[in-house]
């Protein structure tokens, strides 16, 4: 997926341009293919497992097609994906809208945060100084990645897109959710990759509506500093 993203962007650079550290600075790829790893892990699990997706849903969708029996082993999926209250195509969905449609239509409960809420989780000057002033190996690497991201996107301060989904695993009350059904558009050109949300109290999908942005940022900083 790293290489695929770069190849896609060479042809048509999207507004949400992905960037990453050089390949040599990233952890080595696991020898087992991601799809096989998912299937084996889920089939061998003694209890239900919670999945987290912060990129394209290609591997999850492929695993569901290859081994439908894993559905009963997934209790729910947390995802940074989509945009539910404004008509924007979000990067993780547009990388593979068909995969996203398969996952959202699978019957698995999904708790998703989209651009509607992640764009509110923005660092301020003090947060950035704190990050850049730290000297631990982890935070040095995060500083390097943050500078690369800001340079690529043109933003002065980083936005906690994917980290918000991770924080939600730790504290669900950080985001006000709305329950309903998500439909991923895979027809036509203009709407391809849009995530359409229909409110329904009985729905198995929950999407973020409001976020306690300051608490999210503080939690992220706290965890990174304590770990790093």
Where are these regions (language model features)?
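Flexible, glycine-rich active-site loops centered on histidine and acidic residues
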Residues: 15
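Active-site histidine-anchored catalytic micro-motif
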Residues: 18, 22-120, 125-126
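Short glycine/serine- and small hydrophobic-enriched flexible loop segments
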Residues: 1, 62-65, 168
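Single conserved hydrophobic/aromatic residue that forms the stacking wall/gate
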Residues: 1-10
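Conformational coupling and interaction surfaces
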Residues: 94-98, 104-106, 110-228
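A short linear-motif detector with a strong N-terminal bias
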Residues: 2, 29-31, 56-59, 88-90, ...
